[in-house]
């Protein structure tokens, strides 16, 4: 298996061992590269691609934590280790609510695990390292810029995501390492914000405190044993205090209900919504997957009601092969 593309973080923002009270090199050796192959008929093939690459973190013997979209519907996974070896992995599972994914290494890794810390204890302004596979030259010294709610266009909400600055250029699955050398989050996205008349980029990190409640189920069953949220199968964004549909999942509930790109979501069961987070939470409050979701929409000057028969998103995905 060929190595992942060669690149380096600019030297000015690479972490220096003398700046940290823990063994930086040891901590970064726990971060692995990840490369996955997705079948062409996968539900996420068009949106996320047939080949995906990023990072993962060794959190237990042979167990790698990553961001779930890298391994969703993966039929083949390769792990690139700090010593140059490449080991095949098995996608154990992906949790839709948190965004975490788990991979089991099918060969010996022989590197230390990164101890899990507390994301709740992490403070805005705290010095952190965003660790990428390949050591210091592919890792970034930064700080926590914010801890706040995040809503994603794919029907996803975190009550308190972590945002770091500057942004890591290969953020997916990176390890957010605290000032004490503990794992406090997993890299998910790069976002842009305007500040002092200029645009700057941040990383959005999934906080590690969301992992313990889901870890055992993911490891054993490939998904979490909880009531499944209703899924509408639409992509939406906020534009001037309005929730606007920007995409429809093929053959999903919204497509069956003939919701269209450009529709404005006015209300859920009569309750007005103006933010993504409020929209999703009102939908989820109406029951579990399969629940009928009453929406009020606005389209081309006309306001109308529609009922969407929600579904379980996982039923549209190729699941991990249990072993």
Where are these regions (language model features)?
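A short, Trp-centered hydrophobic/proline-enriched beta-strand micro-motif
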Residues: 25-47
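Gly/Ser-enriched beta-turn/beta-hairpin loop segments
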Residues: 41-49, 92-99, 147-162, 194-196, ...
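Active-site loop architecture of trypsin-fold serine endopeptidases
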Residues: 46, 74-76, 111, 131-143, ...
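Gly/Ser-rich catalytic serine loop of serine hydrolases
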Residues: 50-55, 113-119, 161-179, 250-256
């Amino acid at each position: 298996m060929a190595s992942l593309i060669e690149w380096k973080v600019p030297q000015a923002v690479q972490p220096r061992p003398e700046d940290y009270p823990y063994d930086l090199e040891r901590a970064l050796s726990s971060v692995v590269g990840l490369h996955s192959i997705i079948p062409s008929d996968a539900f996420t093939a068009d949106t996320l691609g047939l080949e995906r690459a990023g990072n993962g973190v060794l959190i237990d013997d042979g167990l790698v934590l990553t961001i779930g979209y890298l391994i969703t519907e993966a039929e083949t996974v390769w792990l690139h280790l700090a010593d140059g070896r490449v080991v095949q992995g098995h996608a154990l599972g992906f949790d839709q609510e948190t965004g975490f994914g788990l991979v089991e290494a099918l060969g010996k890794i022989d590197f230390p695990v990164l101890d899990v810390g507390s994301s709740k204890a992490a403070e805005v302004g705290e010095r952190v390292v965003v660790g990428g596979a390949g050591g210091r030259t592919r890792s970034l010294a930064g700080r926590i810029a914010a801890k706040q709610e995040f809503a994603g266009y794919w029907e996803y909400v975190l009550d308190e995501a972590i945002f770091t600055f500057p942004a890591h250029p290969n953020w997916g699955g990176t390890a957010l390492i605290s000032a004490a050398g503990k794992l406090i989050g997993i890299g998910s996205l790069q976002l842009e914000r305007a500040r002092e008349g200029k645009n700057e980029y941040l990383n959005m990190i999934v906080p590690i405190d969301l992992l313990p409640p889901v870890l055992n189920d993911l490891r054993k069953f490939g998904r979490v044993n909880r009531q499944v949220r209703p899924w509408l199968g639409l992509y939406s964004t906020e534009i001037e205090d309005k929730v606007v549909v920007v995409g429809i999942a093929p053959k999903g509930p919204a497509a069956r209900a003939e919701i269209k790109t450009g529709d404005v979501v006015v209300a859920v069961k009569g309750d007005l919504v103006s933010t993504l987070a409020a929209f999703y939470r009102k939908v989820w409050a109406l029951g579990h997957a399969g629940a009928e979701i009453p929406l009020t929409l606005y389209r081309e000057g006309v306001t109308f009601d529609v009922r969407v028969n929600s579904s379980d998103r996982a039923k549209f995905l190729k699941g991990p092969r249990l072993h």
